[in-house]
Amino acid sequence: MVKFETVRGMKDYIGIDAEKIRYLESTFRDLAKKYGYSEIITPVVEEFKLFELKGGEELRQTMYVFKDKADREISLRPEITPSVARAYIQNLQSSPKPIRLFYFGTVYRYDEPQYGRYREFRQAGIEMIGDSSILADVEVLDLLYNFYDKLNLSKDITIKINNIGIFRKIMDKYNIEDNLQEHVLHLIDKNKVDEALVILEKNIKNKDIMDFLNMILTKKEAKLEDIESLAELEEVSKLDIKNEFEYLLRLSRILSSLNVKFKVDLGFVRGLAYYTGLIFEVLHPSVQFSIAGGGRYDKLIELYGGLPSPAIGFAIGVERTLLVIKDLKVEEPINVIVVGISEEAIPAMFTVSRMLRKEEYKVVINTKDQPLSKLLPYYASQGFKLAIIIGKQELEKNMITVRNLITRKQISIPLENVLDAIKQTL
């Protein structure tokens, strides 16, 4: 007999596990709306070229790509930012700026499955398009921090930040071509710094600059005074990157004033190839990987054929975030089981069920053909708090019996008074 299972790297979420995902989704959605963001829903399937154009070395190698019936090369989205950029050009380019958008959806990557890494997973994220100010950057980071604060994780997480513009400006100055730049950044992202330095040395051929690069790549936690000192170095002036360091100083001071827990890691880069300035990731001490990340991508929309538009955003790994939450208690409505003793009780069963559901109770109608002596203990073991019993005597008097399955307290009252009876038995 054929046996079907989930595809490798994918997972079913049932009951409370599904509820936790929906809880994170609703928490994020409510918060994003309070910041003035509007929801965008984009297709799971996009043209492969959308991601190939500026997807980054790693991303291009780990995608689901196939030909459709029209022989077009199609892919399952490995992330959502390019789809939002495409949708912005297609639908929103003439709208007043900045555009604030948020999303929640599944993405797909053909990675080797392991702890915290899946082939299908969920991302919640935002994009702000049309604003290049530091205020926009702070808003995005503040929203991200407040999301984790709502999950009671703000004391545990650290937001790691850097300015990838430092590396891009240095490589641009020495005319290092784009593809090689992405390869170098990919190596640094994968902690292959020595390999990256070998490539840079072949192209830069300047010992002072290489010493400077070696120094900043090992600055894993730069203090304000470190950044101030670096900004005054002769190499920084020669490379025309003083503004990039001063930006980090300004941002650090603002985040400190907002009590956001962060660190500046000058050796930190992100693997996605479209970042141009600020980059950041959310770290939690219980896992070795980031649980969220993002950055500024000021050239992506122009690359896709749109008008030049600065942009910044982030994506939260939903499943990864759930891994670091120790005790997520999703509020459940009170569970009520409605038991009818005969077929004649069916109209009354549905009448009372409708009344309770309007009041946000979770109501299940019993379909088991078993005696009450077995049904009530069974439903108590399944987490039901109340049972509404409609038997022959109740039908004759237009009454119902409400029983607390925990305390065993019960009362019989007219059907229309069911809400009062529930309050009395709880």
Swiss-Prot record:
Enzyme class: ligase
Single Gene Ontology MF annotation: histidine-tRNA ligase activity
Record key words, sorted: Aminoacyl-tRNA synthetase, ATP-binding, Cytoplasm, Ligase, Nucleotide-binding, Protein biosynthesis
TM annotation in the entry: none
Principal location: cytoplasm
Gene3D superfamilies: Anticodon-binding domain, Bira Bifunctional Protein, Domain 2
EC numbers on record: 6.1.1.21
Listed GO CC annotations: cytoplasm
Location(s), subcellular: Cytoplasm
Enzymatic reactions: tRNA(His) + L-histidine + ATP = L-histidyl-tRNA(His) + AMP + diphosphate + H(+)
GO biological process: histidyl-tRNA aminoacylation; L-histidine biosynthetic process
Keyword Transport assigned: no
Similarity comment: Belongs to the class-II aminoacyl-tRNA synthetase family.
UniProt cross-references to HAMAP family, sorted A to Z: His_tRNA_synth, HisZ
PANTHER family: HISTIDINE--TRNA LIGASE, MITOCHONDRIAL-RELATED (PTHR43707:SF1), HISTIDYL-TRNA SYNTHETASE (PTHR43707)
Protein name from the UniProt record: Histidine--tRNA ligase
Provenance organism: Saccharolobus solfataricus (strain ATCC 35092 / DSM 1617 / JCM 11322 / P2)
The gene coding this protein: hisS
